[in-house]
Each structure stands twice: as structure tokens, then as C-alpha cells.
Amino acid sequence: MADEEDIQPAEVVELVGRTGMHGEVTQVKVRVLAGENKGRVITRNVFGPVKVGDIIMIKETAREARKLAVR
């Protein structure tokens, strides 16, 4: 289980696209608001409704999602 210190807030700055077999996941770019990676913009996959400006809590700020492939 993750410690409280591992969870960091991040602000959604851009919606990249939908992914997953049925489009149930949104790929977003987020700006980390706290911790050692503060200010860094990373790409993450998010379940559920999300819009630009939302604050989400992410466990690992060092991990990034793979870029969406165009088919």
C-alpha cells in the first residue's frame, strides 16, 4: 500500500485522447503541483470523467503513460 507521501496532486492541463479497448480511459497531460517533481508536465491515463483544470491525485510522479498510437 502506498504511503501518504507518495500521493501527489496534479492539475490537468491538456486532454490528449481516449484509449482502452472501449475508450474508457482518457490520456491527459498533468502538471505536478507538489513533491520532488513539482512543475513537471507528464502524461498519465485517467479513468472516469476529467476536464482541463481538474486536480487529480497521482501515486507515482516518475511514471509516464506511453504515447497513443495512430492506427
Swiss-Prot record:
Matching NCBIfam families:
PRK04007.1
Gene (name only): rps28e
For this entry, the protein name equals Small ribosomal subunit protein eS28
Regarding protein family, the annotation reads:
Belongs to the eukaryotic ribosomal protein eS28 family.
What PROSITE patterns does UniProt report for this protein, alphabetically? RIBOSOMAL_S28E
UniProt record, GO biological process: maturation of SSU-rRNA; ribosomal small subunit assembly; translation
* Gene Ontology MF, one: structural constituent of ribosome
List the InterPro entries hit by this protein, alphabetically. Answer: NA-bd_OB-fold (IPR012340), Ribosomal_eS28 (IPR000289), Ribosomal_eS28_CS (IPR028626)
